[in-house]
């Protein structure tokens, strides 16, 4: 039977009704989760269709096992995102026959042991790209790469160290994250590695390693040495009893650099590696291939090479009975029942994932390329298939912790709230592990289970002390899953549940949005007129559960409130002093540590700080996180990475008016030699390259064209910068040459850039370079290029390429004036790393 196709408008309208008027939730669902084919046809009208799709597929798996859940029972758990919410890839992919993609949210790849050859490095690069094209986020560790200056037995003679390969992997991520594909990357390194300082500094250079998150793995010895201001020995190989290279450093100096960089740019994140390994249940099987080497991009799942994880969240708010009322309570009986079912559903999803991987491998087999070309991708998925089936790792987590606490009248960050949260997460741990043991009785334990291997693991010992019967049954019957739990960020998931995200507090209970209006329309209230004369109406947006609090306490959400009245309302609510920017940060870190005791994987959480905090606070937070038993920690200081998170609250003391202005410095005579960046990109299926000449770090000229036209430019992919040299031929003709250094330091010159590119492209490039020379703001240059009325299709493609190349140089946080977010309709787009990001809804678009 032919499936019905819905228009975007039909699906959005029905979803808007489903979400009770929440436009953002409706648009995000249609854009991200509704089933679509490769032509963009939509086959689901609302989340109701999606939930039946998921329920029917999980029920099909259930039917293979005893005590099977029915599709209706499963649907009731999923309906309206009330209780159990598969996250991301499972929500999109389960029952979706239009995609050949994995159901896993994240993967770790790499080598377990010494493998620092160029071949191993290239192999990881290819595997990273192959996973990203199937929707996967990827993490891998660089500690196996030789430090800079080490002797190597090839033509280079010495190793380049970590940083060039960071850039390589980052560029691969940015390359694959085009044309609708996804790319998310985590790079990690041990602090014990002699190049770890260079790794920590790599992202401090603007425009470098922009396609990866970076985290440094800190051992207890380093942390203690940093606190005590004592020396610390780095070595390579990092785990060798007989290292080939050692270096003694001052631990506190390197620690201060980590703190400074995190304060300034939110990276690196820190991973407390000894805690991770000590607490890791899978590492009881390290010698069988389950040695943890890195984490996924968000940090909530430490993994061994070629393992993966699927995520699911339990909506904590839904277990609060009589929310925001004096008699509110948490229904632990229903919660325990649903935790067991969530673990069961996650195990079913592993079976569905194995089917998906089989389909991926079948597609690879059927692809027309020869076996040599396909071998690496096929071998990659074979390894992932084996690990997924052998360990059956799951990622059961939660969302709406902040709303749950508020609904119970508890203020996030207080001792009372933390104590209750710890009780909830202890319940999750015991319930999920009990469910895994029960499934081992019915379905069989994961194949390498061995109770003796796990008997000294601190997490297992904690479970045994809390529930001796569970531990005895586990030893007797085994366990279905090697590890079960995590707490992931639930960004778009929380839009669907209309709650706070993960274990985070509410960002803001009340904020303002602007909507453009026609001042001549009836019932329109003009609050703001911009510099172009457009009129806007400002309206208050309440956090969904803040509205529930208002209704429970006799306040009308539909009424128009003054700012003073809103401030009074917030002060009366349980959200007062409990937002992400004003919770007690040290208490939040301690809360994370206490919850971590009951999570076998890790917790992804960010400590949001105001812009004016000093570096010492970041230092204290990181040290407290280590001492509290956290497995990792990330801080974000407001404005430190402009444009990612921007508070809607304006500075009341800021005076209106134009800022002081001085004319830009104009260099009339071009220096003979300019530093230059090489920017590669793809338009449709054509590969393009741009050479951007820089003066004082600002674009001064640009040469752009096809990389693989008839003339061709023989430029290694590793080349990202060089110099543009202006020369004069014997006949007086001026020409521009590009010179770069290879990895051995030898210079290569490509002569006559003007002859390498299409003449028409060259003439337009001269025009744009003239504008750049006189320091027109980059965003205005892009606007100018975009407005050019050009006739031929090829020159319009070139025009798009120039825009993409120049976007890299827009300062992060620059407003994209006059542009509307396609997701939420607000004019709140800013540039971040060359992409447009909406500060209202978080939607992003690159290219």
Model-derived regions: residue spans:
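Cysteine-rich micro-motifs
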Residues: 834-844
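Conserved, charged catalytic cores of large soluble enzymes
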Residues: 2-68, 154-168, 178-290, 321-326, ...
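Terminal amphipathic helices with adjacent charged low-complexity linkers/tails
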Residues: 218, 284-286, 296, 302, ...
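Short, cysteine/histidine-rich loop/knuckle motifs that typically chelate Zn2+
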Residues: 822-826, 840
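Internal maturation/activation junctions in enzymes
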Residues: 75, 235-238, 338-385, 389, ...
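Short, Gly/Pro- and small/polar-rich lid/capping loops
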Residues: 471-473, 647-694
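Function-dense linear segments that define catalytic or interfacial modules
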Residues: 57-63, 77-154, 162-165, 176-179, ...
């Amino acid at each position: 039977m032919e499936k019905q196709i819905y228009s975007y408008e039909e699906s959005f309208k029905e979803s808007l009704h489903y979400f009770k008027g929440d436009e953002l939730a409706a648009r995000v669902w249609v854009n991200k989760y509704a089933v679509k084919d490769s032509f963009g046809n939509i086959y689901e009208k609302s989340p109701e269709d999606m939930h039946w799709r998921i329920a029917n597929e999980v029920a099909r798996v259930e039917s293979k096992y005893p005590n099977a859940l029915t599709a209706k029972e499963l649907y009731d758990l999923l309906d309206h995102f009330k209780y159990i919410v598969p996250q991301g890839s499972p929500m999109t992919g389960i029952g979706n026959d239009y995609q050949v993609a994995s159901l896993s949210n994240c993967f770790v790849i790499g080598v377990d042991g010494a493998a620092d050859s160029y071949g191993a490095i290239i192999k990881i690069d290819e595997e990273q790209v192959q996973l990203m094209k199937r929707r996967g986020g990827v993490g891998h560790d660089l500690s196996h790469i030789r430090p800079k200056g080490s002797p190597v037995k090839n033509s280079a003679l010495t190793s380049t160290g970590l940083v060039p390969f960071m850039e390589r992997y980052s560029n691969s991520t940015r390359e694959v994250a085009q044309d609708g594909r996804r790319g998310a990357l985590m790079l990690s390194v041990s602090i014990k590695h002699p190049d770890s300082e260079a790794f920590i500094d790599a992202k401090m250079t603007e425009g470098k390693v922009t396609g990866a998150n970076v985290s440094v793995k800190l051992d207890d010895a380093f942390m203690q040495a940093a606190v005590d201001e004592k020396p610390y020995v780095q070595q390579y190989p990092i785990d060798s009893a007989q290292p080939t290279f050692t270096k003694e450093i001052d631990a506190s100096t390197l620690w201060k650099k980590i703190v400074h960089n995190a304060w300034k740019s939110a990276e690196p994140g820190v991973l407390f590696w000894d805690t991770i390994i000590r607490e890791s249940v899978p590492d009881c099987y390290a010698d069988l291939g389950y040695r943890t080497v890195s984490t996924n991009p968000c940090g909530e799942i430490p993994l061994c090479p070629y393992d993966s994880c699927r995520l699911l969240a339990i909506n904590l708010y839904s277990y609060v009975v009589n929310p925001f009322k004096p008699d509110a309570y948490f229904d632990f009986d229903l919660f325990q029942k649903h935790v067991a079912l969530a673990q069961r559903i996650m195990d079913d999803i592993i079976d569905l994932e194995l089917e998906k991987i089989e389909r991926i491998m079948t597609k690879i087999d059927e692809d027309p390329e020869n076996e040599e070309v396909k071998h690496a991708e096929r071998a990659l998925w074979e390894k992932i298939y084996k690990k997924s089936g052998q360990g059956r790792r799951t990622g059961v987590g939660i969302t709406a912790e902040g709303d749950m606490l508020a609904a119970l009248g508890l203020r996030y960050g207080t001792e009372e709230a933390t104590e209750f949260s710890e009780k909830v997460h202890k319940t999750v741990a015991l319930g999920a592990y009990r469910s895994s043991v029960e499934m081992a009785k019915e379905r069989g334990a994961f194949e390498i289970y061995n109770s003796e291997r796990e008997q000294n693991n601190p997490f297992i010992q904690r479970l045994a002390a809390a529930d001796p019967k569970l531990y005895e049954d586990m030893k007797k019957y085994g366990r279905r899953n090697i590890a079960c739990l995590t707490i992931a960020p639930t960004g778009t998931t929380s839009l669907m549940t209309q709650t706070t995200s993960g274990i985070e507090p509410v960002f803001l209970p009340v904020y303002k949005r602007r909507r453009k209006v026609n001042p001549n329309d009836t019932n329109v209230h003009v609050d703001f007129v911009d510099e172009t004369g457009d009129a806007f109406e400002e309206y208050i947006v309440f956090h969904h559960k803040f509205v529930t609090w208002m209704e429970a306490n006799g306040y009308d959400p539909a009424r128009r409130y003054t700012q003073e009245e809103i401030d009074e309302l917030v002060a009366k609510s349980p959200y007062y002093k409990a937002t992400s920017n004003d919770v007690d940060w040290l208490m939040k870190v301690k809360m994370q540590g206490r919850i971590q005791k009951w999570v076998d994987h890790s917790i992804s959480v960010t400590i949001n700080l105001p812009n004016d905090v000093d570096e010492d606070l970041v230092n204290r937070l990181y040290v407290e996180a280590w001492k509290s038993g956290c497995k990792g920690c990330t801080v974000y200081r407001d404005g430190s990475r402009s444009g990612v998170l921007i508070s809607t609250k304006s500075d009341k003391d800021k005076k209106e008016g134009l800022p002081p202005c001085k004319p830009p410095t104009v260099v009339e005579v071009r220096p003979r030699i300019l530093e230059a960046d090489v920017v590669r990109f793809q338009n449709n299926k054509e590969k393009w390259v741009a050479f951007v000449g820089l003066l004082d770090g600002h674009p001064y000229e640009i040469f752009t064209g096809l990389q693989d036209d008839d003339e061709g430019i023989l430029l290694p992919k590793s080349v990202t910068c060089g110099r543009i040299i202006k020369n004069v031929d014997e006949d007086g003709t001026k020409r521009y040459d590009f010179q770069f250094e290879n990895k051995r330091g030898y210079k290569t010159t490509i002569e006559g850039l003007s002859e390498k590119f299409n003449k028409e492209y060259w003439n337009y490039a001269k025009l744009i370079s003239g504008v750049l020379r006189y320091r027109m703001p980059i965003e205005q240059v892009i606007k100018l290029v975009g407005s050019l009325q050009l006739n031929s299709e090829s020159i319009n493609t070139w025009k798009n390429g120039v825009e993409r190349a120049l976007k890299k140089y827009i300062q992060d946080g620059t407003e994209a004036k006059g542009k509307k977010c396609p997701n939420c309709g607000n004019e709140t787009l800013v540039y971040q790393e060359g992409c447009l990001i909406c500060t209202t809804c978080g939607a992003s678009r690159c290219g």
